[in-house]
Regions:
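Conserved interdomain linker/interface between the two RecA-like ATPase lobes of SF2 helicase motors
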Residues: 129-133, 137-214
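Conserved helix-turn-beta segment of the N-terminal RecA-like "Helicase ATP-binding" lobe
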Residues: 22-48, 146-152, 225-228
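Conserved SF1/SF2 helicase motif Ia
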Residues: 2-25, 39-40, 122-126
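Conserved helix/coil segment N-terminal to the catalytic DExD/H
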Residues: 49-92
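Conserved strand-helix element at the start of the C-terminal RecA-like helicase core
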Residues: 12-26, 194-224
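Conserved ATPase-coupling elements of RecA-like P-loop NTPase cores
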Residues: 26-27, 55, 76-81, 98-113, ...
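Conserved helicase ATPase motor motifs in RecA-like P-loop NTPase domains
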Residues: 96-106, 113-143
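Conserved helicase motor
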Residues: 44-56, 70-71, 158-159, 209-212, ...
Length: 245
């Protein structure tokens, strides 16, 4: 994307994320990247339900890179595509993050939305390249074809430099005092492991399936760190959907 901007200042990119939290996070990261490489003068912003009206107009008319979600493409861009003609006519790249999310009914809706988007782009003389990303999918080529009706080239090898990595599958221990088949709570194991790792200076991220579970693990980790490494307790923070920017 940076190469596209460097080659052509008029190019446009649309980055699509399934959640507002992820969209905001990637927007902040991209801004830091632009600053690091010295690319200035480009209007980059988030276009979602919380975006003020004046910023929406500026992004529509002058935006180079827009971070958004499927709902906003459907409700704002497609229903008023005439107002977006300048952006859509210069659209060179569409990025679909977390591709695996789009399955079932959501996937069907997304497939139809993308077909509408690309049809409107053709109407304005644009043929954007599509880039999709996912770390948890077994059939990326098949899903990409179903969603976009276009063939793709799968890049499934990470060529970036990295240090040694160890993968451990952790099974909570059995509780002998009760039923032999019972095991300790995975959430309890998770917060104890996280606290021990942080106390030993290991940067740690813990994922959970629900927002409430994330908050619960966060509280337990902080409580544990106050016992074993008080200086680290203030360095832990939860991050989930539902927070305001």
């Amino acid at each position: 994307m940076l190469e596209l901007l460097q080659r052509d200042a008029e190019t446009r990119a649309l980055l699509v994320f399934p959640t507002k939290a992820l969209c905001q996070d990637q927007f902040q990261s991209f801004n830091r990247l632009l600053s690091a490489v010295g690319l200035t003068g480009y209007l980059v912003g988030v276009f979602d339900g919380d975006t003020p009206a004046d910023l929406r107009r500026r992004l529509r008319d002058k935006g180079s890179v827009i971070f958004t979600n499927p709902d906003m493409i459907h409700a704002a861009m497609m229903t008023q595509h005439g107002r977006w003609s300048e952006f859509l006519s210069c659209l060179s790249l569409v990025v679909l993050d977390e591709l695996h999310v789009y399955s079932g009914i959501l996937g069907s809706n997304m497939a139809l939305l993308l077909r509408r988007l690309f049809r409107v782009c053709r109407h304005y003389g644009a043929a954007p390249q599509i880039m999709a990303l996912s770390a948890t999918i077994a059939n990326p080529e098949e899903l990409f074809l179903k969603l976009t009706a276009r063939p793709c080239v799968v890049v499934d090898r990470d060529g970036s430099p990295r240090g040694k990595r160890t993968t451990v599958l952790w099974n909570p221990p059995r509780i002998r005092q009760t039923n032999w088949r019972s095991r300790r709570s995975a959430n309890v194991e998770a917060h104890e492991l996280m606290a021990r790792l942080i106390a030993n200076g290991v940067p740690t991220i813990t994922f959970s399936k629900a927002k409430m579970t994330a908050e619960m693990i966060y509280r337990y980790v902080c409580d544990k760190l106050r016992e074993i490494a008080p200086q680290q307790a203030s360095k832990v923070t939860p991050y989930r959907g539902g927070y305001r920017p």
